[in-house]
Structure formats: structure tokens, C-alpha cells
Amino acid sequence: MNMIDLNSDLGEGFGQWKMGDDNTMLSIVTSANVACGFHAGDPAGIFQTLKSAHKNQVVIGAHVSYPDLVGFGRRNMDVSSNELIADVIYQIGALKGLAVAAGTTVSYVKPHGALYNTIAHNEYQALAVITAIREVDDNLVLVGLAGSKLLDLAQENGLRTVAEAFADRAYTPQGTLVSRREKGSVLHDANLVARRMLQLVTEGGVEAIDGSFTRIQADSICVHGDSPDAVEMARQVKLTLQQAGITVRSFI
């Protein structure tokens, strides 16, 4: 692999409360997963992030979530298929409207938090998200966890998919993310993270939390924008990859 996308979750501030440094991150990443108001983000803040993304020629995705502002979208929800379909359609539609006003477009969908993790293995909710995307625009790309059943299911239903790996998260030997409740699940050393992502691209996998090698085939790397180390981490990952002759660009 000589090309990879670098993405980040942005637009997650709320009113006077700021989350991350969106403007700086948008000068580094090639794709931006922009909050749609259900787990974070207010209309004015989202609009500003979209305008900044457009200015930096960054591709935009809808970062859809369960309706969970208090829990930042990290709490599982047992919702009906119809409710989840409507929630996802609503969020994509809202972001599309703001994107048009900002002079840009929404090109993909990446679910957030608990929804992201649930649909990686829960076919019932996965099909609801896939249906919602197709109802709005079947040209939208779905970004999901590398190696998950979701990606196969989405492809079977006519969606283009992108497999994603996480720069700042530890992996199990099975290639899944280590739970945030466990020690060592979140990585903070920018140099270590950069070396791991170079290994991912050049060797097709990373060292798991137990020291074994786990295979991960990914088209995009995510650096979480809410991490205090996000800017340095994203910058170091991009620089390390580019110095190794790897092109960092969006999958669109």
C-alpha cells in the first residue's frame, strides 16, 4: 500500500465549550468526520468547521450517532430499526444542508462511538444504518471498522465502503479495539503512534496489546480530535508516512 487517508472526528464543540483544535487539525487531515448534533456539535460550530474544511480542501463525512449528548454518543442504545433509520437520515440531511451553505458537500458517513462499535457486529442496527444512507444518497461511502461484518454487509447492499484503523487506540489479538475501560486502550505517545501506523501501512497490521501481531487491512487512519495530543499525533503520523514515501490523501 502506498496511499492512505488520514481522518479525524471534528465539529464536536458545543456553544462556548470547545472540543479540540479543529482549525489546526483541518490543516493536517485529508478527511473530516463532522458531528451532526446528536452526540456533540451545535449548528454554528458545525457550520464553522465545514467552512474551514472547505477552505483546506478536506473531504467531509457525516459523523452520525445515537441521540446521546450527555454520554457523548458512547452509550449503547436499544433502538428500533425505524427510529435508527430516521435518526441517521436526519443527521445526514442536516449536515448536507450546512455543507451546501458552506460551499462544500458530504461525501461519506462514519458512525460515531457506541453506534460505530455496535454496527460492526450487530446486523439489525447495521442494516438500519445502511438503509438510511441508501435512502439519502447511495453514492455516499460508508466508513467502518476494518475487518468488521458491517463492511461486507454494506457492500452486499450496494454501498462502497472504506476500512478504518485507529492511530490512538490499542488492538486485541483478534483485530478489534481494546475497550476504553481497560488500561492501555488509548495511546498518547505521538512517536509510538506514528511508528505503529507506518507498520500498519507497510506490513498490513500492528502490534496487539499482548505483544502479538494482528493483521488489519485499512484504507483510512483515524486520529480522535478530542484527544489532548491529537494535533501532534496527526502531524507526526502524516510526516512519518510521507517520509516513507506513502501518499496521504482522501479515499474520495
UniProtKB/Swiss-Prot annotation:
Similarity comment text for this entry: Belongs to the LamB/PxpA family.
GO MF term (any one): ATP binding
CDD domains the UniProt entry points to: LamB_YcsF_like
Organism: Photorhabdus laumondii subsp. laumondii (strain DSM 15139 / CIP 105565 / TT01)
Subunit annotation: Forms a complex composed of PxpA, PxpB and PxpC.
Biological processes annotated in GO: carbohydrate metabolic process
Top class in the EC scheme: hydrolase
Stretch forming the signal peptide: none
Name of this protein: 5-oxoprolinase subunit A
Entries under InterPro entries matching the protein: Glyco_hydro/deAcase_b/a-brl, LamB/YcsF/PxpA-like
Coiled-coil annotated residue ranges, if any: none
Keyword Transit peptide: no
Function: Catalyzes the cleavage of 5-oxoproline to form L-glutamate coupled to the hydrolysis of ATP to ADP and inorganic phosphate.
EC number: 3.5.2.9
Keywords per UniProt: ATP-binding, Hydrolase, Nucleotide-binding
Catalytic activity: 5-oxo-L-proline + ATP + 2 H2O = L-glutamate + ADP + phosphate + H(+)
